[in-house]
C-alpha cells in the first residue's frame, strides 16, 4: 500500500506516494550533500554535514521539535529549520509504518543558531492550522543512583561505577546534612555521552543489580538547565551548599561580609544550603572566589552563582518528576520549598506524568479551564468512555486500567505509624483481586506520607509502574525518545506485565522510608469509591 501525505509546501491537498516521498528525500540529499541513514527508530540527516572537521557542536546547540504532522518529512522540514542557521544533524523519529512519530531533534553548529531557531520557529505554522513547538533539547548524560551505603566516599563510588558501566566521567556526591563524614545515600553519575548513560541505565535498571550488597535505585537525573549568559551577568545572588544544619543565617552573613563589610544584603538558609544576596554583582563575584572551599562551623562549603529559575520550566520539571543535582538551587531561588532528590522533600504539586524516562523531554500538554456558559449543552458520559490521557491522577489511571482489563476495582488498605517527632505517617497497600494469586499479591511503596491524598496517589503510582503501564499511551505529546515500543494488545485490553521497579522521586508531600525501624500500626480499609483524590 502506498504511503500518502498532503504536501505542505503550498497547503494544497496534493497526494504523495511512498515513491514520491523517497524521490523527494533523494533530491534533498543531492541538493545539500548531506547523508541520510535510518537506525534505532530514527532517521538521521547529516551528523556531520559535508566538509565538517573537528568534534560535534557542544551542548546547547540542539533543539527539540514537537507537534510535527505525521506525514511531513525532511524535504519539508529541513528548509524551514535552515532559516535559523547551518544544521549539523537533523534526527526525525520514525514509526515502523513509515510515518514520523511527531517529533524531531535539530542540532545546529552554534548555540546562537539554536536560540534563534527557538525564537523564530516556536509556534510556527508549518501547515495551515498546524503549529510546531520548538524548545531547547537537554542531552542528558547523568544518572541518579540511589540506596548507596552512606559510608562510601566519592572515590569508592567512582571506582565501582567504572567497573560496572562504561564511559563514566565523574560522580557527584553530597555529604549528609547532619554528618559530613557520610554521604546522603545517593549520587549522580556523569557519562561521556547520552548513549553511554542510556546503556548504563539499561544495565542497572532491572532492580536486581547490587553494589556493595545493596540493591540500588537507578533513574535519569534531570540535566541542569542552562541559563543564557546575558541573564547570568545580572545575577548577584550566591548559592552556598554543604553548610552545617546548626549554622545560622547571622553566621553566614558575618562570614561573607568579612571580605567587604556591608556587602551582603540578606541571607536565606534552608537546611544545609543558603542563598546570599548582595547589593551589587561585583561584590557577589568577588565573594564567590574568596569563599568557595572555605570552612564555616567546620564544614567546607561550595559557592556558585545562583541560577535564576524559569517558572514555566520549574513547573514542567515538577510535573515530569525529574531529579536534578542542583534542584535545590532552581526551586528555592523561586521561593519554593526545599527538594531532596529521591529522599525527603517538599514540592507543591502531585505529578501529572510519572514515566521516569526523560531525555530530552517534549513539552507537556497544557492543562486549561474554559468558560462554562449558561445554556451549554451537556451530555452524560462514563469516565471509562474517555481516553487515558484525560486523567492526571494515578488513582484514576489505576481504576481505568483495571476496568479496561475487565478486572475488579483495586482495593486500598491504609496503614499508619508514628514518627519519632510524633507525626502520623500513612501508607497504602493495594490489592488487585484479578492478579492477587499471581506473581505479585499486593503492591506497597516503601515511602510513608503525611497526608492521605499523597499516600493514596503514591501507592497508585507505584502499582501502575509495577504493572508497566504507560500513563499517556494515546498522547503523541507524551512520547519520549528513549521510551521502548509499547506492548501490543487488543483494543479493549491494556497489556499487563509485572516487573520489579526502582521508582523515581515523586513530587509529593514529605515522605519517609518504611525502612526506618518503625512498626506499621493501625489498619483501615478504605473503599475504592471514596473521593480522596
UniProtKB/Swiss-Prot annotation:
**Keywords of this entry:** Cytoplasm, Differentiation, Meiosis, Oogenesis, Repeat, RNA-binding, Spermatogenesis
Where does this polypeptide localize?
Cytoplasm
Give the record's GO biological process terms.
cell cycle switching, mitotic to meiotic cell cycle; female meiotic nuclear division; male meiotic nuclear division; mRNA stabilization; oogenesis; spermatid differentiation; spermatogenesis; trophectodermal cell differentiation
What GO molecular function annotations does the UniProt record carry, in alphabetical order?
A: mRNA binding
Q: Where is the RRM domain?
A: 61-139, 141-223, 236-308
In terms of Gene3D superfamilies, this protein maps to:
3.30.70.330
Any one annotated GO CC term: nucleus
InterPro entries, per the entry: HnRNP_R/Q_splicing_fac, Nucleotide-bd_a/b_plait_sf, RBD_domain_sf, RBM46_DSR, RBM46_RRM1, RBM46_RRM2, RBM46_RRM3, RRM_dom
- The principal localisation class reads cytoplasm
Q: Which residues form a coiled coil?
A: none
The record's function comment reads: Essential for male and female fertility, playing a crucial role in regulating germ cell development by ensuring the proper progression of meiosis prophase I. Regulates mitotic-to-meiotic transition in spermatogenesis by forming a complex with MEIOC and YTHDC2 which recognizes and down-regulates mitotic transcripts for a successful meiotic entry. Required for normal synaptonemal complex formation during meiosis, binding meiotic cohesin subunit mRNAs containing GCCUAU/GUUCGA motifs in their 3'UTRs regions and positively regulating their translation.
The record ties this protein, via NCBIfam families, to: hnRNP-R-Q
Complex formation = Interacts with YTHDC2, MEIOC, MOV10, CNOT6L, DDX4, UPF1 and PABPC1.
What is the designated name of this protein?
A: Probable RNA-binding protein 46
> Which species does the entry assign this protein to?
Homo sapiens
